């Protein structure tokens, strides 16, 4: 024995040095772990997070749970998890599931932990399942256990405990019920619920835990202890394997605690047992912990004592083993410490065990029911939310279908009413008098034979874009419907465009077309005004033709263009009055807007005449009862026109801008029938141009054949396309006027913002001597659009319109300030720009309060 002990000392020293080197190596490499993490290694936090996600197992993920047994720490079940049979140990408290320090343990003789369930009410530990059960159960059965199997089990238990101690884990509850047999008949040490992680080599105070029959004396006495408590428990397990009996059977628990603690009670050894095995058991059951060998020594000793076991044959082993069991049963303990005097279990003890088992089962069933009720509640709540989502989705689908149906209906209703939005015309520079077109013009009253507009025609810039023949969108920059008195709301852009002929000769020629009186036509709602910048056909070749082919001469406005036809401005707002006369109630309503063709004077305007005090003479739109005269060129035969007449004008050449070198005298000599107006002198100032226009004399134009006149001032003679004259018609009172100009009632001519004398303002009034409406022919002019020269000039005009008695400089400053806040101008913008507000106020509260109020858009 001494030699064996001496030989065992060398491995002990080797293990000591090996452990020292291992600690040194671990300490050195631990310093470089943070640095190595920067070179491809995962951070520690990410590793822990990934492990935590796999460590937590939901209890409902485990299926087919079956009860296996119960103990002091809880019941044990087996079930299926991820196509694997697992053991589920149900514990009573959450802290018992805190075994993260054990999940890294990987040994063939240590049970593998798969995860924990830390969700209330089922606190469980999921581990590897061993189908053959506990070691104590296998030993008590009459199964055949060979010598090799017995020797292997002893060695495997020692190997497993040695692995735990190397990892600083103290089991503290090593016993045969916590040693399982796998399907391969290998040992699996389990039940680490009472294990302790040893952080120091010194002995520590441990709590009273474990089963008293396998408990070390120092633990019973609550003395400082270390890993040697597991060695004592291992000695008790060896005695149990040798005798196949429960240690200290039929002895009360308190008697075991007292007897083991005071060294009065011990386990007797069979006399016929192998000497080496008996010596190992006695060393492990030493009263002092320092006298017990470590598991590394136990492994070495067993390798020495094992040949003695194999000296016997298998039959001799089985006979000797049975005799060891009979010896254990014959052990007599004092009657004062036994429970039932060494007899079999009483009926009361069996009933008590049955009640405990039933109580554990009922508690488990209660917890499972509570868990599934909570899950059912969550499922019902999710179902209600999902049902609400489906209901909301159906409502939204119904609303969407209704909205699409209404949208289709609106598009069908406004298919002929809503013009499309088109891009603005390109910008080009013009100075002086402009000749947008020189051509022979054909006029026709047949709508079906309309000539499509030419792509790039300058006459498409008011209600239609210069780049396409479709109508513009309402309230867009170039749309004439923005400030129409008859247009109340915005309309969809889904309306159909005007028909464009597919004839290439018509599409790409210089011809153009206009529609008089149609909804959305240029004659009704375009910027054909004294400042719109569009060529006036009434004073040029249209007037010259004088009703050729039965056409009605169309009226266009003219002005001095500064930055081309692409610059658009805001429209004007016109006010409307109800017809007070009862005689006019049956007549169709007439809409009037500023800058419409009806406001353009068609006769000679006398700038020197004083401003009339009568509203009838001051209004731009003529009275319904005003004298009318039907022109000779009208093809309506004095009949009521059911719909608008169209005028198609075919152009032979493109328009050109006149030069100051044009010879007016030579042209007048060649065409004596044409009376020419004085040409506007070239100037770089808009104010000077307006003043020069006011100083020129008006010349009435006569029709000629195919020669364009020189352009006149913005205020000149115009031909009304719907002009009807009646004789001996008396002038009505101002109260019979249907519509009055919201601008003429509160301002003078266009250049009154720059006139320094009040006398010039009185002489610059625009008076219409003709009417745009008769009983035979009535047209509705809905929209208008005014193109200003620049933002500053536009602002000055607004300031003059809102004259409140201030000086000219104050009015200009106020206009500029208002323009900066409210006016936005772009040269070419196809999108509709919504302005903040357009306001017009009456300049005279006493005179025009009934006719012109504040209009806001």
Swiss-Prot record:
PROSITE patterns: PROTEIN_KINASE_DOM (PS50011), PROTEIN_KINASE_ST (PS00108). Keywords: ATP-binding, Kinase, Magnesium, Metal-binding, Nucleotide-binding, Serine/threonine-protein kinase, Synapse, Transferase, Ubl conjugation. Residues 753-762 have a biased composition (Acidic residues). It is found in: Synapse. The keyword Chloroplast does not apply. GO terms for molecular function: ATP binding; MAP kinase kinase kinase activity; metal ion binding; protein kinase activity; protein serine kinase activity. Residues 62-304 form the Protein kinase domain. Coiled coil: none annotated. GO terms for biological process: response to stress; signal transduction. Residues 467-488 have a biased composition (Low complexity). SUPFAM superfamilies: Protein kinase-like (PK-like). Its EC number is 2.7.11.25. Transmembrane segments: none annotated. It comes from the Eukaryota. The active site is at residue 173. InterPro entries: Kinase-like_dom_sf, Prot_kinase_dom, Ser-Thr/Tyr_kinase_cat_dom, Ser/Thr_kinase_AS, Ser/Thr_Kinases-Pseudokinases. Residues 609-623, 763-772 have a biased composition (Polar residues). It catalyses: L-seryl-[protein] + ATP = O-phospho-L-seryl-[protein] + ADP + H(+); L-threonyl-[protein] + ATP = O-phospho-L-threonyl-[protein] + ADP + H(+). ATP binds at residues 68-76, 89. GO terms for cellular component: cytoplasm; synapse. Ubiquitinated by rpm-1. Negatively regulated by ubiquitination by fsn-1 bound rpm-1, followed by degradation. Its main location: other. Its cofactor is Mg(2+). Component of a MAP kinase pathway that functions presynaptically to regulate synaptic architecture and presynaptic differentiation. Phosphorylates and activates mkk-4. This is Mitogen-activated protein kinase kinase kinase dlk-1. It comes from Caenorhabditis briggsae.
